[in-house]
């Protein structure tokens, strides 16, 4: 790369002229030094700048050189600028251009270069100030939106989803609370397909918030305030008492039978639960929970209060295929035959809030104020002697019984579900009322008399079975050990609807005398 050539003329800029003088003066002295050394000569340089400052260079001693100069008579060669220019033209140089000097003087910067570098630095600083702020810092928190379960408000979950919570919270990725699991919360849902939460006691499920939703028998979609996985067969307590055997972690011991004989402290509640029979809760139950005798004792201790909170289950599968006794515990775990919510919604009995008719039952009407609870049966309905009593007078006040659509046989198109689901017992059906037999290893406290549901569904009634859970009457426990495999009276028979009351009485007698 060649040297940069400049025009040999006076530099008008004072700064540039000073820089050029310094550089070229040093270059001249450098050349003089080289010449003096290489050629063994004496050189003296005397330079005055434009402000008459003296700059001199002497290879040995200036005085000696000057003395020789004064003593020398005639110079051998004397040149001026004109002679130099003429000599350059003869050698082929233009004389107007001169290359920049090399060596140490080229290391120095001119004022023009300094200004150029300074302007470039200022421009770069401006660019960094303008665009540097948009670059994110190394430590930043990216905001994200995550779903969390609300601990206080009741939620309505979809039948097809596991846990739907509408609340969203925006937090940072560095928030340690996002790494902690959410606490279980009570959910109010219509279908419980095996969610991970369950309540600590039945009192939280049977609070006063349900009183406004019961009694009028709304549609089964939005009526049950239950735990996320619990089913009617796993809730053996009616009036806010703790779950005795199902969830013993936070539950007090079960109250005695004498305490249960008092007047109920809550209004009658009707809870329609469309459970799909989740299998996941079976892993949480021990053998003691699945013991039929324990389940019977639980049902007997709660027999007097079972009328206050009946449970109407519309999706519990059948137990007939397994040959199990009618126990309240395993009713929600047979998923061989299920009635999904889509089929229930297509039925006229469950498609409207008025689908569940209560008939002439006075205890399941609109809820009365809390200070007027429905008392249990009067003292005249105390347990009779151990001998079986085949029938009761038909003028007796109709009892309340839970109704369930659990005993559905595969292939049965539900021909007996009419326009309403009546939960009253037929006045012409034989009724069995006897105390608990001690030989069955049940609780020695005898339950008050109650009735079983109708032997088979009628046009005005739904399919009835004792699989409605542990919120039923105590006679569930009486017949629980007596049923055995002969449960044909609960299957929807293919006989015509005009079957007389004598046939029903005969079938119920077969049931009670077994």
From Swiss-Prot:
Portion annotated as DNA-binding = 58-86
Gene Ontology biological process terms from the UniProt entry: apoptotic process; chondrocyte differentiation; endochondral ossification; nervous system development; osteoblast differentiation; positive regulation of DNA-templated transcription; positive regulation of transcription by RNA polymerase II; regulation of DNA-templated transcription
Write out the entry's keywords from A to Z: Acetylation, Activator, Apoptosis, Developmental protein, Differentiation, DNA-binding, Isopeptide bond, Neurogenesis, Nucleus, Phosphoprotein, Transcription, Transcription regulation, Ubl conjugation
Residue ranges for the region (Disordered) are: 174-207, 244-269, 364-399, 430-514
UniProt tissue specificity = Widely expressed though mainly restricted to skeletal and cardiac muscle, brain, neurons and lymphocytes. Differentially expressed depending on if isoforms contain the beta domain or not, with the total expression of the beta domain-lacking isoforms vastly exceeding that of the beta domain-containing isoforms. Isoforms containing the beta domain are expressed primarily in skeletal and cardiac muscle and in brain. Also present in lung and testis. Splicing to include the beta domain is induced in differentiating myocytes.
Site (Cleavage): residue numbering on this chain? 288-289
GO MF term list: DNA binding; DNA-binding transcription activator activity, RNA polymerase II-specific; DNA-binding transcription factor activity; enzyme binding; histone deacetylase binding; protein heterodimerization activity; protein homodimerization activity; RNA polymerase II cis-regulatory region sequence-specific DNA binding
Claim: Transmembrane is one of the keywords in the record: no
Q: Which family does it belong to?
A: Belongs to the MEF2 family.
Q: Which residues form the MADS-box domain?
A: 3-57
**Per the record, GO CC terms?**
cytoplasm; nucleoplasm; nucleus
| PTM info | Phosphorylated on Ser-437 is which is required for Lys-432 sumoylation and inhibits transcriptional activity. Phosphorylation on this residue by CDK5 is dependent on p35 and calpains. Phosphorylated by PKA at Ser-121 and Ser-190 represses transcriptional activity in embryonic and postnatal skeletal muscle, and stabilizes protein levels. No in vitro phosphorylation by PKA on Thr-20. Phosphorylated and activated by CaMK4.
Coiled coil (UniProt feature): none
Source organism superkingdom: Eukaryota
Task: Tell me what this protein is called.
Answer: Myocyte-specific enhancer factor 2D
UniProt xrefs under SUPFAM superfamilies = SRF-like
Segments of this protein annotated with the region Beta domain: 286-292
Cross-link Glycyl lysine isopeptide (Lys-Gly) (interchain with G-Cter in SUMO) - where?
A: 432
Q: Where is the composition biased (Polar residues)?
A: 180-192
Quaternary state and interactors: Forms a complex with class II HDACs in undifferentiating cells. On myogenic differentiation, HDACs are released into the cytoplasm allowing MEF2s to interact with other proteins for activation. Interacts with HDAC4 (in undifferentiating cells); the interaction translocates MEF2D to nuclear dots. Forms a heterodimer with MEF2A. Interacts with MAPK7; the interaction phosphorylates but does not activate MEF2D. Interacts with MYOG. Interacts with CCAR2 and HDAC3.
Q: Where is the PTM Phosphoserine found along the chain? A: 98, 106, 110, 121, 180, 190, 231, 251, 437
